[in-house]
């Protein structure tokens, strides 16, 4: 069957395309310039989406706002709601999405979990500094490649942190993804100066926080980055 889909989730858009399902529209953050855009993940144009008469709109509990999902539902637009909070949740969530769009899902193959590689903090924002919390997809990826995440205690999924506190935790690695904040070399140098004895590494943010068809290869790539740090001294 052919399902007319609008995806408001960048990870889902990438996954659908990998399955040869071309969305009728997506968000401007999906990095698909050839597809029509219907706003952003937090500010979708619900009227434009409804006008497309989709069979299904893919949303995510964390990525998208509840009020936008409710507005679409009130207009009679069918929703497929995803909630991926860990690497282990990916196969089940993708199986449900594949069923909703009528495709046979390719198997999700993850590399074996790795032994202890030390500790890490993964930053996601600057001004204020924010890090991944323990109960997030990205933190579960780090655990899978052998890095215990030590950003902060508590239930906050994206806690505010200060670099002095990060330094006190003495992480072996500080991970700087290219999104949602576009960390670059100048930020790496800034953090390296304040968190001595840690490797501060820039990584493709999609590999850390986008789940879906890329998950297996993303875990492999991130593991390879960490392998490259073995035996290397942190830059001073």
Describe each region flagged by the PLM:
Residues 1-236:
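N-terminal ligand-binding lobe of clamshell/alpha-beta domains
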